[in-house]
């Protein structure tokens, strides 16, 4: 089924509102195996909408129109579709009853004739009830093309799509997806490594997406059941993770989790809870961002004891009992300082882990280190590990954000090695 989405509304063309409905519809249609080939926006103009309907009817088997179902003069979607199909507009009894109730409960509201238009549908259409508004939607098939009209406000469109439209469009197959999350490898390198799989993909498919500090891979397949989809996605996932970087490192080492909402922080927090271990932090350039990220999750008092924000040399010495002369000798941006910060954070809070971050967020260099230089220390019973990462060419906010991601990844690896 080839689908086309037509957004009706001059306010979209003038930039007054963003057409989020198209993104939502495309995503939900893809989940049930319906491919969207075209997205178009047209103003509140009958002639131009008629022209667009003529084009859409020739190239698409499902035409979805959003917006223009309200009571005002420029709400002309249903009227124009009826004219295009040579059909009349008729009243939907359920929608009329909803109008009756609405105005009965609001005696101060004037029930003007134009309000009645919201209860009309194209003759022969299946009504799509509006759970949160008054304008009824509709679904109609004519000459092999299915036409759907939906309200423009997302608060009305979304429940109508989820509860009314999608169940009526369901076919034998659906689109199933799996998201793999990678940290420590760039999108360009990952795409180069997976070039053969990407170039030769048919079904399942894979698509890379770069995000701040990480890369995700979306694996998708059309199948009649979750079990059937899992078989296909498992094969593709193993093919991906069996690949190696140019240095011979397996991609499995970079894949940290699954899903749209998963993050390095959520993985670490859950693993700390599972293992019953605690962590403390001492932060300089990130100014408490690691600690704030941990405490964004609920019920973390069992794993997070306390922390330190030691932005200046003096506070590193005072709060963490690191001799000032040693800090001056080695520099605040150094392996030594990261090591001592982590060890003192762990010792002072009696935690299983102590994590530290010190570096140069920018915009200026510090102690001869370029912007983006970060030292991260992780102290635990077995000893202390310090890594140096270079996060160059980024904004100050991105340097801090990615540094925290590196810190969580360091903790994650330590937890997995236990």
From Swiss-Prot:
Pfam assignment, any one: CinA
Cystines in this chain: none
Top-level taxonomic group: Bacteria
SUPFAM superfamilies from the UniProt entry: CinA-like (SSF142433), Molybdenum cofactor biosynthesis proteins (SSF53218)
Family matches, as InterPro entries: CinA (IPR050101), CinA-like_C (IPR036653), CinA_C (IPR008136), CinA_KH (IPR041424), Competence-induced_CinA (IPR008135), MoaB/Mog-like_dom_sf (IPR036425), MoaB/Mog_dom (IPR001453)
Stated family: Belongs to the CinA family.
Database matches in HAMAP family: CinA_B
NCBIfam families tied to this protein: cinA_nterm, PncC_domain, PRK00549.1
PANTHER family assigned to the protein according to its UniProt record, in alphabetical order: NICOTINAMIDE-NUCLEOTIDE AMIDOHYDROLASE PNCC, NMN AMIDOHYDROLASE-LIKE PROTEIN YFAY
Protein name per the record: Putative competence-damage inducible protein
Protein's organism: Streptococcus pneumoniae (strain CGSP14)
Gene it is expressed from: cinA
